[in-house]
Design a protein with these regions (language model features):
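Conserved ABC ATPase "signature" region
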Residues: 1-17
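Conserved catalytic motifs of ABC-family nucleotide-binding domains
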Residues: 42
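Catalytic Walker B motif of ABC-type/P-loop ATPase nucleotide-binding domains
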Residues: 46-50
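H-loop/switch region of ABC-family ATPase nucleotide-binding domains
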Residues: 82-83
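A short, surface-exposed alpha-helical micro-motif characterized by mixed small hydrophobic
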Residues: 88-90
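H-loop (His-switch) and adjacent beta-strand-loop-beta switch element
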Residues: 95-107
Length: 128
């Protein structure tokens, strides 16, 4: 059993957390452990709801880099919700803006600079 857990944690570079109690994990560490659970068994599509919530800035970058690596290594599609526009610009290859219904979709740059985004968030692309 321990070998299987280490294998799962290894997918998200978190083997060193195997003996840590869940309550003692940082936000980023907890997200890695939860992601390891979500990847067993390996899905075709990984759906994440605000995975950056509660994670510090350094942890966000590390988590997104790791998600990108997992996506490539395991040929996964990742669908995630986020309000972190900086991470969207850096990592997303397709963005869908939803406010009760699909308002627009495209590249992060296109969506974040679009009129629909400005209407929903009362912001413009230049301010992001």
């Amino acid at each position: 059993m321990r070998a299987k857990v280490l294998q799962c944690l290894g997918r998200v570079q978190a083997e060193g957390l195997i003996d840590k109690r869940m309550g003692n994990l940082s936000g980023g560490e907890l997200q890695r452990v939860l992601l390891a659970l979500a990847l067993e068994p390996l899905p075709n599509v990984l759906i994440l709801d605000e995975p950056l919530s509660g994670v510090d800035v350094e942890g966000m970058t590390a988590l997104m880099d790791m998600l990108d690596e997992v996506r490539v290594n395991y040929d996964l599609s990742i669908l995630m919700t986020t309000h972190n526009f900086d991470m969207l610009k850096r990592y997303a290859n397709q963005v869908v803006l939803i406010n009760h219904t699909v308002l627009c979709d495209g590249t992060a740059e296109d969506v974040l600079s679009g009129k629909e985004f400005a209407q929903v968030f009362h912001r413009t692309g230049e301010a992001i």
